[in-house]
UniProtKB/Swiss-Prot annotation:
One Pfam short name: Cytochrome_B
Xref: PANTHER family: CYTOCHROME B (PTHR19271:SF16)
Keywords associated with the record: Electron transport, Heme, Iron, Membrane, Metal-binding, Mitochondrion, Mitochondrion inner membrane, Respiratory chain, Transmembrane, Transmembrane helix, Transport, Ubiquinone
GO CC entries: mitochondrial inner membrane; respiratory chain complex III
Cofactor(s) required, per the database record: heme b
Further information: Heme 1 (or BL or b562) is low-potential and absorbs at about 562 nm, and heme 2 (or BH or b566) is high-potential and absorbs at about 566 nm.
Membrane topology: Multi-pass membrane protein
Binding partners and assembly: The cytochrome bc1 complex contains 11 subunits: 3 respiratory subunits (MT-CYB, CYC1 and UQCRFS1), 2 core proteins (UQCRC1 and UQCRC2) and 6 low-molecular weight proteins (UQCRH/QCR6, UQCRB/QCR7, UQCRQ/QCR8, UQCR10/QCR9, UQCR11/QCR10 and a cleavage product of UQCRFS1). This cytochrome bc1 complex then forms a dimer.
Residue positions binding a ubiquinone: 201
Gene behind this protein: MT-CYB
Disulfide bond sites: none
Residues engaged in binding heme b b566: 97, 196
Organism the protein comes from: Crossarchus obscurus
Entry protein name: Cytochrome b
Entry note: cofactor: Binds 2 heme b groups non-covalently.
Length: 379
């Protein structure tokens, strides 16, 4: 009798994706983050589902309902903080995953990479709309500022913004539709993630050396299942440490003040994982220019495959490109810091220089260093 694992129509799919999947024998812990994001997504959907059972998407009761969840619902506080900090863990894994893709040349799997960029945009949209739901000061003003950016679009901008708001300002209609979208998007993300895996399994995984590993594959289970479980335990330990010891560390104190359209907070800023993009947005003194730079800061990932000049896929044996990569990481950390600072000297000029450097590294220096390294190999 043949194994049911290999013959059953449904179990066969799982088997070919997680058990008998031929995997390179040398992939490092940097390849853990995909599965960690899968776990984050499941965790977010589950905690979000339980929060939605008690949350009300009405401007008069939204803030109170979140307070009610934390005070009166059994274990509501832990569900709420796991959901809020789970988003942060999700983005940490996301940034590591994208960084890994850039370092090891995974972007040459074009379909997988482009679906990944689409996933990144969708996750960012979901997180933004989720941040609006508690209806605190930063929720309200964050929603106002970010949706207002669309008014920079020539001719249709103002109409578009009012259409998204469902009125002439961020109000009840906006909150209700954001809740609806925030609920549906994670399921769209799940579908995109399945497509992401589908295209990845067409080619097989990349590996740190960047050369074909077809001659040296091992089954995913038990080798990488156990390795993924280790990564999972580390991530859950970090998440629960954050949730149980300092749940508000990454939040904004202003969000504990109910939304008030008549009182603007002194510093409007998004959650930490958007600060790098926010800094790029603010570094351009023109509204439309800033919005374009904001979109390009992520869309620039889409042209990285076209800018790959090196004869080698991975950066493992390319010291010049490695230096540029880590400079890019440092630059992103600088942008994240600047995004949380007030708009005054010297932060303005630091933000502008960091923004220029960000685009310069990806669009100019990386391709040049790849070409230089090709020449160096001839010596």
């Amino acid at each position: 009798m043949t194994n049911i694992r290999k013959t059953h129509p449904l179990i066969k799919i799982i088997n070919e994706s997680f058990i008998d999947l031929p995997t390179p024998s040398n992939i490092s812990a940097w390849w853990n983050f995909g599965s960690l994001m899968g776990v984050c997504l499941v965790l977010q959907i589950l905690t979000g589902l339980f929060l939605a059972m008690h949350y009300t998407s009405d401007t008069t009761t939204a803030f109170s309902s979140v307070t009610h969840i934390c005070r009166d619902v059994n274990y509501g506080w832990i569900i709420r903080y796991m959901h809020a900090n789970g988003a942060s863990m999700f983005f940490i894994c996301l940034f590591m995953h994208v960084g890994r893709g850039m370092y090891y040349g995974s972007y040459l799997f074009m379909e997988t990479w482009n679906i990944g960029i689409l996933l990144l945009f969708t996750v960012m949209a979901t997180a933004f709309m989720g941040y609006v739901l508690p209806w605190g000061q930063m929720s309200f003003w964050g929603a106002t500022v970010i949706t207002n950016l669309l008014s920079a679009i020539p001719y249709i901008g103002t109409n578009l913004v009012e259409w998204i708001w469902g009125g002439f300002s961020v109000d009840k209609a906006t909150l209700t539709r954001f809740f609806a979208f925030h609920f549906i998007l994670p399921f769209i993300i799940s579908a995109l993630a399945v497509m992401h895996l589908l295209f990845l399994h067409e080619t097989g995984s990349n590996n740190p050396s960047g050369i074909s590993s077809n001659s040296d594959k091992i089954p995913f289970h038990p080798y990488y299942t156990i390795k993924d479980i280790l990564g999972l335990l580390i991530m859950l330990a970090m998440l629960m440490t954050l949730v149980l010891f300092s749940p508000d560390l990454l939040g904004d104190p202003d969000n504990y003040t109910p939304a008030n359209p008549l009182n603007t907070p002194p510093h409007i800023k998004p959650e930490w994982y958007f600060l790098f993009a926010y800094a790029i947005l603010r570094s351009i003194p023109n509204k439309l220019g800033g919005v374009l730079a904001l979109i390009l800061s992520i869309m620039v990932l889409a042209i990285t495959p076209l800018l790959h000049t090196s004869n080698q896929r991975s950066m493992t044996f390319r010291p010049l490109s490695q230096c540029l990569f880590w400079l890019l990481v440092a630059d992103l950390l600088t942008l994240t810091w600047i995004g949380g600072q007030p708009v005054e000297h010297p932060f303005i000029i630091i933000g502008q220089l960091a923004s220029i450097l960000y685009f310069s590294i990806i669009l100019i220096f990386m391709p040049i260093s790849g070409a230089i390294e090709n020449q160096l190999l001839k010596w």
